[in-house]
């Protein structure tokens, strides 16, 4: 670390220091040459400068000799810089392979060594399935390096990013190596976490399997495996590629889904109407690419609120009709869960009249997400919407929605507008890894945000509680068979694990519906309990959420349950459920409060 910092300092300031020293010594040499000699008169400053510039290094004395030395060193600087870069990478190679302990490994970029043509692996539509995540990997490494050691393997890193990474303490490897070689070079045998995010999902699967091989002998290693694009992630089954004993240590992720999950947690669309029995959610969604589709799907799963009304979504994109048809092809049940209105427009074509029409809809806008890949386009629409909001009558009782714009990796315009723009706090910028400007506004560690989104702690506690309750019922009813999903977390299909994750994600929605919030337990004088009518309301919301999650996963109603054919008898309105089944929903709500208590948290009335 010290050697790396020294190399970075010399590389960054070496030339400046050499030039300053050279100019200083040159001045001393000129001054020395102007002094009168015993057998000659004093010379002018210009004559002394000329003599200094044309002096012979072999005959130089005093300051002139020092000047020639510094001049030669400065000329050699280009070669020294090349050497320093080589030495720096060699030191990083040594440090990662032999010295790193309990570190995070991030492997990203495109691998020529492991391309399908070189390995014999063949992927259909290979070019279309490659998604560059280099920028995200660099920003993630910079963010995570503030709290833990990080080793980044990325083949191509420009000079400015390389300097940033070194200054942050990130160990950087740029060689393109075979799977086993890159894991050995990054010290995977002693690492605590591997984040495999190469451009092709096949490489990430191979890296994760190699990391769990017996030769690595690291039973504590956790792996986060990127599966892109979204079309592949939708049908991906973890159990098709990994053995059951490996599943607990693997979490697949997709950047668009992580963004959707986090953006709806940080800026929930129901916030202005959460406690209303009448008002419904109206989301304006600009961009129906991978992020927009993930947000829409997340809303369909979690958008079950106190009012019982379907969320309304106004979707704006230049090719929105075709994109919406493709979504319905993958999820035909969406039409029964969200009310979608499509507006086929380019962002540049949106006018103030369009914005006013959405704002003054019979169901007023409660939130706007702007999530195209073009930050300039995002900025235009965000400012247009903010300006129309500010132009409204301040005495109006209409909802004041928030505007959230997605900031792509490497972006800076939206961050600047968020911090310095005139938006009266109704504009927010979102990124998985905030920019420097955003970090000035928050004390949270950005790198941990992404990792925490892949943490299954609460979901596993939900499942363990479900299994414990089912075991008790089996003991009380001799001959009763355990429920189909009453088995260890490691043996659950990914869809069942996702169902538990959704249960955890929906809890804050439920708390807002009864005007509660989650706070540290020590900040609460007396513990609160849910009133019977509150518990019943939240149980209904939980059932609606579960119902939506099941039908989006392909389940249909049938009087007899069949897991293989995805039949379930409880896919009916809450009022039609039997009392024991309703109690399961109530228990789910109460279990979340127990989980919060275990984490040192409690529910309290919203201030």
Where in this protein do the model-derived segments appear?
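Short leucine-rich amphipathic alpha-helices used at interfaces
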Residues: 473-475, 480, 517-519, 524, ...
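Amphipathic protein-protein interaction modules
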Residues: 526-579, 584
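In a subset of proteins, long, contiguous C-terminal domains/tails are tracked
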Residues: 80-86, 567-607
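Cytosolic regulatory regions of ion transport systems
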Residues: 2-24, 30-69, 73-481, 485-540
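A structural signal for well-ordered alpha-helices, especially hydrophobic packing surfaces
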Residues: 508-511, 550, 593-596
